[in-house]
A protein has these predicted regions:
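Long, charged N-terminal accessory/stalk domains
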Residues: 151-152, 158-203, 207-210
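Conserved NTPase motor "head" modules and their coupling/switch loops across ABC/AAA+ ATPases, GTPases
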Residues: 5, 20-61, 199-360, 369-373, ...
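Structural recognition of the conserved hydrophobic beta-strand(s) that form the central parallel beta-sheet
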Residues: 387-393
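A short helix-turn-beta junction within AAA+ P-loop NTPase domains corresponding to the substrate/partner-engaging
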Residues: 402-411
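Conserved lysine of the Walker
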Residues: 66
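Walker B catalytic acidic pair
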Residues: 364-366
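Nucleotide-state sensing region of NTPase/ATPase domains
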Residues: 74-159, 163-175, 228-236, 288, ...
């Protein structure tokens, strides 16, 4: 599949044109969730919330189902879940199917989006008309913050890549398509390597891998280079330490060859082999194709020896640095939390800048994990124009001023 490079930021006309006509206007104007109902979903037989405002706090003991409701919101708004479950896990034990229905409005008209889950299948409808998941994904992007995210600064590059890819998939449909194509091709290649297939067969698969891999690399790097200044600025605003923050993206063809990133003027962008960047902020795809193809040929014997694919965007490295030191090894717990908080707020900014509308913010039991300063930063950022859902076991970590403007639901 050959795609023109158009995933550059600021081309709102292109983003609108690629979105389904029935949903295009509403994304531009911004959507607000007014009602949500679930049946036979997770632990809920029936549950509904109506007349939802900008801030909803779900309070209850562990295991009561608070997180399940956030997951329901994300499944409908983003066509995905931060838990990455199998469909059978979403259906209440003893039931044959489950349903989530959400009402949204842009201020002029109401939209009903529903998700039916049964027998390993999921079916979306918008105002009663069947839609593919790709048509629903990103119509109301969701930014999710869970306790697991607090380890983002210390965890491996795979977690950081996944976070970028999940954001990118909500910003443009092409990102998700290219990512899915690449992952499918990669799985096939790894099976061939494991089965010790012929060099000619693997070389043929590498041609497809180069096509979709170079596209994914360009999409991800464009998003990374656009997001990093936001992340850097927000981290500086919320950090009390005054240390310089930087991030690097090191392509697989460099780190597999033993090339190390060098911090400098472009430390928040690409590290390693210089890559030409076009005016739209995208890497030169022809150069990326050439680099990836050459690297695959150069490391073909090593991949065959290890029985796994070493080269491609699935093995690119992303690292955070504080004062020039690797944050995964040297950052304090407080610094790690500041990095993750800055990352999540930068995600919100990217949705705003790219789609011209606010996301829905889903905060799963993170208020008690943050100190007062970071809680206030998060709450102040999630101002009245960002619809926010928060879960908590109790309200002790909440500012009284925040509680005054919240709808509190005891589960």
């Amino acid at each position: 599949m050959q795609l023109d490079w158009t995933f550059h930021f600021g081309l709102d006309v292109w983003l609108e044109a690629k979105r389904p006509t029935a949903l295009r206007y509403h994304v531009r104007m911004g959507l607000h969730i007014t009602d949500i109902a679930v049946s036979d979903f997770r632990n809920y037989e029936r549950f509904a919330l109506g007349e939802l405002g900008n801030l909803t706090i779900l309070v209850g003991r562990n295991g009561v189902g608070k997180t399940n409701l956030l997951e329901a919101v994300q499944l409908v708004t983003s066509a995905g879940s931060f838990r990455h479950p199998q469909i059978i896990q979403l259906i209440r034990e003893g039931a044959e199917n489950a349903r989530i229905q959400m009402e949204t409005t842009d201020g002029n008209r109401r939209i009903t989006t529903a998700l039916a889950l049964e027998a390993g299948k999921r079916r979306y409808t918008v105002n009663g008309k069947a839609k593919a998941a790709a048509d629903v994904r990103g119509t109301l992007p969701a930014v999710v913050f869970t306790p697991d995210d607090l380890q983002l600064a210390k965890k491996s590059s795979s977690v950081k890549r996944q976070a970028l890819d999940e954001l990118g998939a909500q910003l443009t449909r092409n990102y998700h398509v290219v990512l899915a194509d690449y992952e499918k091709t990669l799985r096939y290649k790894n099976r061939l390597l494991k089965d010790e297939a012929s060099r000619d067969l693997i070389a043929a698969i590498d041609e497809t891998l180069v096509t979709c891999g170079s596209q994914l690399f360009c999409y991800r790097v464009a998003l990374f280079t656009r997001m990093m200044p936001q992340l850097q600025r927000i981290y500086t605003d919320i950090s009390n330490e005054g240390e310089a923050f930087a991030a690097t993206y090191l392509p697989s063809w460099d780190h597999v060859a033993g090339i190390q990133p060098s911090l400098g003027g472009t430390a928040e962008c690409l590290a390693g082999t210089p890559i030409e960047m076009r005016e739209n902020g995208a890497p030169d795809r022809d150069q990326v194709r050439e680099l990836l193809a050459d690297s695959l040929a150069r490391f073909a014997e090593e991949e065959a020896r290890r029985h796994r694919s070493l080269l491609g965007p699935h093995n690119d490295k992303i690292a955070f640095y504080l004062a020039g030191r690797d944050a995964s090894a040297f950052a304090s717990q407080g610094q790690q939390r500041s990095i993750v908080l800055a990352w999540k707020l930068a995600e919100v900014e990217m949705v705003r800048q790219t789609l011209g509308a606010n996301p829905v913010l889903l905060l799963d039991d993170v208020m008690s994990e943050l100190d007062e300063t970071r809680r206030d930063t998060l709450v102040n950022f999630a101002s009245d124009d960002i619809q926010t859902f928060i879960t908590a076991t109790d309200l002790t970590a909440f500012n009284p001023t925040l509680l005054e403007r919240a709808r509190i639901i005891q589960l």
